[in-house]
Regions:
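Arginine residue identity/basic-tract feature
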Residues: 63, 87, 97, 130, ...
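Context-gated lysine
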Residues: 6, 32, 63, 106, ...
Length: 179
């Protein structure tokens, strides 16, 4: 997800890290420090604030990206139907895990179930290759139909796999594809 975001070179990422989606922001921050992208990364005071940053950037015409998990998704849930209802596109990655009960962080789909009726398009990726592919396609789809999109995948099982993924070698080819 982070490599695709780097290639897309979003305008803004409003974020508040939560396990197991934390690595997405960490890798983007590392790539930013090495000059690999121009994404304005805005750390929020919480997930609700991160959702507000993303919504505001999207209403301002920005190409926007975020990532969260579990209770982070629940904290931002109030804003999801607003964004889909006003038809502002963005990409939100959800590394799915259990909603704390009690304080479990095991992988399951209880968090994504809360997002099913928010009006967001949801693509579920079964492996890191599809996470990458869906992120590249996701922004194109979101901007074409004017709806935000969620790329969901299993927390830990998929989010932390260190498996080779075939990536598009030239960032320019990604830009040409998404427009």
């Amino acid at each position: 997800a982070s490599y695709a975001a780097k290639q897309i070179n979003y305008h803004v990422m409003g974020y508040y890290p939560i396990t197991p989606s934390t690595e997405i922001a960490e890798y983007l921050d590392l790539m930013k420090s090495e000059g690999e992208h121009d994404i304005v990364m805005i750390p929020a005071d919480g997930e609700h604030g991160a959702a507000g940053i993303c919504y505001g950037a999207s209403t301002g015409g920005g190409r926007v990206f975020n990532a969260t998990s579990a209770n982070g998704l629940l904290f931002s849930l109030e804003q999801l139907p607003v964004q889909s209802g006003t038809r502002f596109p963005m990409v939100l990655n959800i590394a799915c895990r259990t909603v704390s009960g009690p304080l479990s962080i095991k992988g399951d789909h209880s968090d994504i179930m809360y997002a099913l009726n928010t009006g967001w398009i949801i693509l579920f990726a079964k492996d890191p290759q599809r996470v990458y592919d869906y992120n590249i396609c996701g922004i194109k789809i979101a901007e074409k139909v004017k709806l935000p999109i969620i790329i969901a995948f299993d927390g830990f099982f998929t989010s932390h796999q260190k498996r080779r993924a075939q990536i598009i070698a030239d960032d320019k080819d990604v830009h040409d594809f998404i427009g």
